[in-house]
């Protein structure tokens, strides 16, 4: 693997979902302009972290992989800028809901989905009210800039996450 420039982004999300997506896009553009090739956005960046409460109205925020406007928008952005974007979103798949991540390659191709395996349930983290445990297994993707693997948030506390990704040949976690 050659040299890879990675950028991370973070911003305060509001219930103005279009504004959140615009902010995320602007941060991706800024990072790409500074030479970043792999740009990470925060978990569930389209909305505030709604899992602090139990309210099933939030289920309406979920989007299916094949029709997700978020994924389409940011895959097109990845292509325009020639960058790789791991994209966290609230996924609806059939009758199940997941905290998921899709990777948009530098040519705009969506390479597939990873669904968060370890779902926390504690004060301020009511994720089991919204998300099923992932059913994809840990994923590694061949991208324009190397083999990347990803866990989502709580997954990091479990050593098998990194071990499984490394055994699959991930060069970057």
Question: PLM features: what roles do these ranges have?
Answer:
Residues 1-6:
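Extreme N-terminal starter segment of soluble prokaryotic enzymes
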Residues 7, 84-86, 149, 173:
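Structural detector of well-ordered beta-strand residues that form the stable sheet scaffold
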Residues 8, 41, 153:
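Generic enzyme active-site microenvironment
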Residues 10-17:
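Short polar catalytic/cofactor-binding loops
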Residues 11, 44, 155-156:
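Active-site metal-binding loops of divalent metal-dependent hydrolases
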Residues 17, 26-107, 113:
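Cys-nucleophile CN-hydrolase/nitrilase-fold catalytic domain and related Cys-dependent amidase chemistry
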Residues 19-30, 156-165:
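Short, acidic/polar
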Residues 63, 92-172:
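Active-site catalytic loop in hydrolytic enzyme cores
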């Amino acid at each position: 693997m050659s040299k890879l420039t990675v950028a991370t982004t973070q911003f305060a999300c509001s219930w103005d979902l279009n504004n959140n997506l615009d902010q995320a896009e602007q941060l991706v553009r800024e990072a790409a302009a500074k030479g970043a090739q792999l740009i990470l956005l925060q978990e569930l960046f389209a909305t505030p972290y709604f899992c602090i409460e139990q309210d099933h109205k939030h289920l309406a925020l979920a989007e299916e992989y094949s029709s997700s406007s978020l994924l389409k928008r940011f895959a097109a952005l990845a292509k325009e800028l020639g960058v790789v974007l791991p994209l966290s979103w609230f996924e609806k798949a059939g009758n199940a809901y997941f905290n998921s991540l899709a990777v948009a390659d530098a040519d705009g191709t969506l390479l597939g989905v990873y669904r968060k395996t370890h779902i926390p349930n504690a004060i301020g983290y009511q994720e089991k009210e919204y998300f099923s445990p992932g059913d994809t297994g840990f994923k590694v993707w061949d991208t324009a800039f190397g083999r990347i693997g990803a866990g989502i948030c709580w997954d990091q506390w479990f050593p098998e996450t990194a071990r499984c990704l490394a055994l699959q040949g991930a060069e970057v976690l």
